[in-house]
């Protein structure tokens, strides 16, 4: 995230004297730039400027040569000899660039360097070293550790260097005593990855006077050669994108300008080097440092090429299959046809040589070296999606790609190149060309039709229409109209995130202050349904019922992979074909979305069991994703534009079905040991009871249908699982998990589970209110009925027959006995029910109850049931 230096910020906006980093953080957070951290210096003094009086080389037995030096550190810090006179400090230094007559940075005893490295007098190589001459890396100023810092070569002007005195505070000189503010920015506000952008936001927060540096730079930039009749361009540039992503060109502006007769030996000025280092970038060379500095200051990534190595035209194109590129970091990359490249044309072969991966990183060929005298400056505007994909594909999160993928100002290229050219001319004696080439295909910004009333409707803020206009103008928008409360607003070139009225409302709310939004309860709509939908109410009832049953709700990630498929006995390859695959999965070993909840819920149960909790009763409500391989392809739509109704319908048609499911897993003991009885392990009946409770709570008339063993899915026990049916509608499974699944997951034996398709289950309900029956005051008639039936007849089937025959006089029915044996015959079983009859209008006589009994017996005979004596 960006590091903010108050001294640099002052270049673009007025800040009060004595502004602290803590106050700066408070000011910026008001406009949405959050404080990540205020970084204090890792270095403490004393650290001073030293003058090397002498440096005597002393070869050592190990082949190394050290220098025994005497360094003048000023009267305050020099040593005192036996006579009480101040004399230079004796210091051992092994750096190869140490020599007499140089001014260096001396860390004195008591100083602490990064990594908690404490400086103390120590005896080494036969001398007492009373301090240390420091390198950039030792002070945390960069990566250079090839030698100590020689202030003569550290970017000071001749006059500044001569003014440096021994004993002068080097902490302040090198800004080692200054903190930095690191801020966190949102992906849609890429312009704040620059001091230009942060200064603008500080202005919005405090009202401080702000000057946009790009305005003056654009005015000074020369007209492109195309606008100067008869003037040749610096170098020909062609944009040839034959594979745009989502129809958006990978490059819509490429600005090229030449700087000739550049001095490759010129040093980066100290102020620029210091700012780059404090921003977290190392100083490389003047040419490279200038492009990096312009990027940090204005927000425009740039690239510098050695012009003498290039042959025009420069061609911006997509990569071809099989092409490779070795980038500046020395790594070779296999290119994708989606990658956008910068190429030149050696020997007339147009676009045949790759110079770099556009907007991400340059290649080895064409880079600026210590011999470069003529430079081609590139400032371009690249598509956000193209750059983001290339950076992630090749794992190159460069500073340039971070900015391009968030959106760069389409009007900034001439200003950035002008600034870079001026700096190279001033510090490198280069001669900027006056004939730049500007290939500009950027689309014209569209006006947004904006109603002032949207601010109150969306954000709840009462903002005066004139203030709305002022705010939009202040952020850079062009505002027209307003007489009738409606504006035509054109977003500035640096705000690609402003596309719709809601974006403008967000900006107004941000700058008025989120703390100014009144706290109000949204009013319920006057017309239509109010509150939860019927299905939402049913979902809550299901959750409440399972919680009352003693189960605990869980929420798992909906991601699955090969291990989950194998644990549940699924064929991984067959399951993948009908599963939704995630393009950029959170977990590499779980790249698919679940088709059932049980596999993901099982991972939560596993985690509990591994931590010693075996008695688990968890349930989860959530979506599953049922991919249809024959579904139409989802169309690719351009960004920044609201899709049409037809496009939305095409998107919807290609989406997978996403029904609501509820699933539960019960393991271990259903009942603990106690005074009422012994331990009872979980079995299929506990899962069935949970399903029955769900059905009873929402008023669903479910039936359990036990299929043949061969028809039971692989994850269920073939003899202890049943389909959950509502009439002819299949709504799920309930029973024990297959022993193989329990073993694979590490579950106790006989672990039970259920999974219901709530979308299908809710669809079977009429939605009509349940009519409560009045409580009858007449006495009940209780009878026990035992029937002999075939083994294939289920208790549920016979119960439905009894309910139908008894009619309105049936108050309750309960199965209390199932019996098989010689007494009932082979292939038969006995089912006994306790039934209660009660009339709402009279006392049932013996004749009434006998008639009901006969009706039940007659109806039961239709399915082969015989009443036992």
Swiss-Prot record:
Xref: HAMAP family: Phe_tRNA_synth_beta1
PANTHER family in alphabetical order: PHENYLALANINE--TRNA LIGASE BETA SUBUNIT (PTHR10947:SF0), PHENYLALANYL-TRNA SYNTHETASE BETA CHAIN AND LEUCINE-RICH REPEAT-CONTAINING PROTEIN 47 (PTHR10947)
Subunit details: Tetramer of two alpha and two beta subunits.
UniProt source species: Bifidobacterium longum (strain NCC 2705)
SUPFAM superfamilies named among the record's database cross-references: Anticodon-binding domain of PheRS, Class II aaRS and biotin synthetases, Nucleic acid-binding proteins, PheT/TilS domain, Putative DNA-binding domain
Entry keywords, A to Z: Aminoacyl-tRNA synthetase, ATP-binding, Cytoplasm, Ligase, Magnesium, Metal-binding, Nucleotide-binding, Protein biosynthesis, RNA-binding, tRNA-binding
A single cellular component GO annotation: phenylalanine-tRNA ligase complex
Domain tRNA-binding residue range list: 41-162
Known cofactor(s): Mg(2+)
Span of the signal peptide: none
Gene, per the UniProt record: pheT
Annotated Mg(2+) binding sites: 497, 503, 506-507
Protein's UniProt name: Phenylalanine--tRNA ligase beta subunit
Taxonomic path: Bacteria, Bacillati, Actinomycetota, Actinomycetes, Bifidobacteriales
Primary subcellular site in the record, as a coarse category: cytoplasm
GO biological process, one term: phenylalanyl-tRNA aminoacylation
Enzyme class: ligase
Source organism superkingdom: Bacteria
Enzyme Commission (EC) number: 6.1.1.20
Cofactor note: Binds 2 magnesium ions per tetramer.
Localization, UniProt: Cytoplasm
Limits of the B5 domain: 443-519
């Amino acid at each position: 995230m960006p590091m903010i230096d108050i001294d640099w910020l002052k270049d673009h906006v007025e800040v009060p004297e004595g502004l602290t980093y803590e106050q700066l953080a408070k000011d910026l957070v008001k406009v949405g730039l959050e404080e990540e951290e205020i970084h204090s210096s890792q270095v403490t003094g004393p650290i001073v400027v030293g003058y090397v009086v002498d440096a005597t080389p002393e070869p050592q037995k190990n082949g190394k040569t050290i220098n025994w030096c005497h360094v003048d550190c000023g009267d305050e810090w020099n040593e005192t000899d036996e006579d009480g006179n101040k004399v230079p400090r004796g210091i051992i230094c092994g750096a190869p660039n140490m020599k007499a007559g140089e001014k260096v940075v001396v860390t004195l005893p008591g100083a602490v360097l990064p990594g908690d490295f404490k400086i103390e007098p120590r005896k080494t190589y036969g001398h007492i070293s009373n301090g240390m001459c420091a390198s950039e890396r030792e002070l945390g100023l960069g990566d250079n550790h090839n030698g100590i810092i020689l202030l003569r070569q550290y970017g000071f002007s001749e006059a500044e260097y001569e003014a440096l005195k021994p004993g002068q505070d080097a902490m302040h000189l090198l800004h080692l005593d200054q903190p930095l503010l690191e801020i966190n920015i949102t992906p849609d506000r890429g312009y704040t990855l620059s001091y230009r952008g942060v200064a603008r936001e500080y202005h919005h927060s405090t009202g401080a006077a702000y000057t946009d540096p790009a305005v003056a730079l654009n005015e000074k930039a020369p007209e492109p050669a195309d606008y100067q009749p008869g003037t040749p361009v610096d170098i020909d540039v062609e944009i040839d994108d034959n594979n745009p992503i989502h129809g958006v060109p990978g490059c819509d502006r490429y600005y090229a300008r030449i700087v000739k007769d550049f001095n490759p030996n010129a040093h980066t000025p100290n102020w620029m080097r210091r700012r780059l280092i404090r921003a977290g970038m190392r100083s490389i060379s003047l040419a490279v440092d200038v492009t990096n500095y312009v990027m940090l200051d204005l927000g425009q990534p740039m690239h510098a090429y050695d012009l003498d190595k290039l042959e025009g035209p420069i061609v911006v194109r997509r990569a071809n299959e099989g092409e490779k590129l070795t980038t500046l970091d020395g790594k070779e990359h296999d290119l994708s046809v989606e990658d956008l490249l910068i190429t030149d044309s050696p020997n007339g072969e147009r676009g045949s040589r790759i110079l770099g991966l556009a907007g991400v990183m340059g290649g080895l060929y064409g880079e600026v070296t210590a011999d470069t005298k003529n430079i081609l400056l590139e400032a371009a505007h690249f598509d956000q999606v193209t750059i983001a994909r290339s950076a992630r594909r090749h794992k190159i999160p460069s500073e340039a790609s971070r900015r391009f993928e968030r959106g760069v100002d389409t009007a900034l290229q001439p200003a950035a190149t002008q600034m870079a050219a001026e700096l190279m001319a001033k510090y490198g004696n280069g001669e900027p060309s006056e004939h730049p080439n500007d290939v500009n295909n950027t689309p014209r910004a569209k006006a947004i039709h904006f109603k002032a009333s949207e601010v109150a409707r969306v954000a709840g803020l009462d903002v005066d229409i004139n203030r709305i206009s002022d705010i939009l103008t202040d952020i850079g928008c062009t505002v027209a109209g307003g007489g009738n409360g409606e504006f035509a607003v054109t977003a500035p070139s640096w705000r690609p995130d402003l596309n719709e009225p809601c974006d403008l409302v967000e900006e107004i709310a941000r700058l008025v202050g989120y703390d100014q939004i009144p706290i109000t309860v949204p009013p319920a709509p006057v017309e239509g349904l109010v509150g939860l939908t019927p299905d939402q109410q049913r979902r809550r009832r299901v959750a409440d019922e399972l919680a009352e049953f003693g189960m605990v709700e869980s929420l798992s990630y909906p991601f699955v992979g090969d291990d989950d498929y194998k644990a549940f006995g699924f064929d991984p390859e067959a399951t993948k074909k009908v599963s939704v695959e995630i393009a950029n999965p959170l977990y590499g070993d779980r790249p698919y979305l679940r088709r059932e909840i049980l596999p993901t819920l099982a991972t939560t149960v596993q985690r509990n069991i591994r931590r010693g909790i075996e008695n688990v009763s968890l349930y989860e409500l959530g979506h599953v994703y049922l991919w249809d391989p024959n579904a139409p392809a989802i169309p690719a739509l351009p960004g920044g534009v609201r899709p049409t109704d037809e496009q939305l319908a095409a998107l919807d048609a290609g989406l997978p079905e996403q029904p609501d499911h509820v699933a539960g897993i019960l393991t271990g003991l259903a009942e603990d040991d106690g005074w009422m009885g012994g331990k009872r392990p979980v079995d299929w009946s506990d899962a069935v009871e949970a399903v029955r409770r769900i059905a009873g709570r929402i008023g669903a008339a479910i039936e359990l249908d036990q299929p043949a063993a061969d028809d039971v899915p692989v994850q269920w026990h073939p003899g202890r699982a049943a389909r959950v049916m509502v009439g002819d509608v299949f709504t799920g499974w309930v029973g024990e998990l297959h022993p193989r699944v329990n073993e694979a997951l590490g579950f106790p034996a006989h672990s039970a589970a259920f999974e219901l398709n709530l979308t299908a289950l809710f669809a079977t309900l009429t939605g009509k209110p349940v009519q409560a029956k009045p409580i009858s005051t007449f006495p009940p008639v209780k009878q026990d009925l035992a029937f002999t039936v075939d083994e294939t007849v289920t208790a549920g089937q016979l119960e439905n027959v009894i309910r139908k025959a008894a009619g309105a006089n049936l108050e309750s029915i309960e199965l209390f006995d199932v019996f098989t044996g010689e007494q009932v015959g082979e292939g038969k079983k006995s089912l006994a029910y306790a039934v209660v009859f009660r009339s709402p209008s009279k006392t049932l006589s013996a004749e009434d109850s006998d008639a009901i009994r006969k009706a039940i017996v007659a109806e039961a005979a239709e399915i082969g049931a015989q009443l036992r004596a």
